[in-house]
């Protein structure tokens, strides 16, 4: 579609596609634009058909699988030589995990026995798939700086969390202490 305002980054939709991980389990979700909602609310339905703005379904990775993959990714990258720089590149994972843990299905999943079993399966899958960082495959998760020294690590990461996430968010981001506490609680479930 032609944009009225050129160079406005807010006029773009970013779709992330990951080809590294196993895309299962997935679930179909309906994508419905705010423009569609606005046109319905203002009784301008004729534009929906005219501009092909109808909702559509897309297969997306389940929330539970997303949560597990983000946790495993953080563990893996924590074994880089420069942990702070490496984890800084994944800072959005902390934000995502925080919001996933606001979802009732994710809360119940994390409390279940299946959580640790599936975490271990994804961890093993990543050990087989990814050689970087060097030597990480033979290390126990209990050796991860995210477990051994998270408070110190988070002190070095929280500024990146505040600045980077605030730049992308349309509303205030969650308090970094709440995000850290959420992550620590998740780590307790995999130790």
Residue map of PLM features:
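Structured mid-to-C-terminal alpha-helical surface segments
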Residues: 1-191
